[in-house]
Amino acid sequence: MKFVVFLCAIAAVVATIQGQEQQQQQQLPATIDHDQVKPFPQPQPVTISERAAMKFKPQLHVVDGCHPYPAVNDAGETGGGLKTTGSPTAGCKGSGWGSQVYGRSTWHRDVWAIMYSWYFPKDSPSTGLGHRHDWEHVIVWISNPDVPNPTILAVTPSAHSGYSKYAPPSADTVDGTSIKVRYESTYPMNHATDVTTEAGAFQDLIMWDQMTDAARNALNTVSFGDANVPMNDGNFVPKLDKAWPF
């Protein structure tokens, strides 16, 4: 009799553990095909920070490799990325749903910093090289968002876990209030961003605070392998510290 009770107790524990594992799996954000992630529509800017982010939105010139894709949708589903097979542009020449640039801004050491981030399904300078997923970003440092004509003080595009720093940027890399950024690899190195004199394309801007809770949670918790989400809660301020150009 005691043995039967013991077996029942073990079965109950196993069932509880399995139930908890299933619940945890159900709570994890889902991963979908990279070309099925729908971007957030660009909202009308309302706040001071949103208007400044829209005013200084950069343009991206893709020299080689993938075009930027949405990384997450409003339900918190993230793109699964691509293997490094095929050419650097294979399977990632642009999303049929449209693209996205992600923004987040704050005061940092008395300078207003606006981080703009792009997601790419793979970072592959050549077939078999590189890795699944890529995140790149540029930080635009301005004087004050709450004045009629803020000044661009510096620009710091991301490059191989570090930054190029321009304080101030050259006039020929700025189109009005828009920094011109290029995305390029120098074989055999992976892709990076830098400023350029070439005009680029704009993507719909969504700010961190404008996204759904599900989307922010996904970007805070989902692993993108060798790439990390620059504007999430764990990376945003440390990257501003590292990119400080003054």
Swiss-Prot record:
Signal peptide feature range: 1-19
Query: The organism sits in which domain of life?
Result: Eukaryota
In terms of InterPro entries, this protein maps to: NPP1 (IPR008701)
Alphabetically list the UniProt keywords.
Secreted, Signal, Virulence
Q: Name one GO cellular component term.
A: extracellular region
Where it sits in the cell: the answer is:
Secreted
| Chief location category | secreted
Work out whether the entry's keyword set contains Secreted.
Answer: yes
Cysteines paired by S-S bonds: none
Give the residue interval(s) assigned to the motif Conserved undecapeptide motif I: 113-123
Q: What induces it?
A: Expression reached the highest levels at 3 days after inoculation of pepper leaves, followed by a gradual decline.
Is Signal a UniProt keyword of this protein? yes
Motif Hepta-peptide GHRHDWE motif II located where? Answer: 130-136
Q: What does this protein do?
A: Secreted effector that contributes strongly to virulence during infection by P.capsici. Causes large necrotic areas in both host C.annuum and non-host N.benthamiana.
The record's domain comment reads: Key residues/motif important for the effector activities are degenerated in most NLPs, including the nlp24 peptide consisting of the conserved region I (11-aa immunogenic part) and conserved region II (the heptapeptide GHRHDWE motif) that is important for phytotoxic activity.
Give the family, as the similarity comment puts it: Belongs to the Necrosis inducing protein (NPP1) family.
Q: What is this protein called?
A: NLP effector protein 2
Primary gene name: NLP2
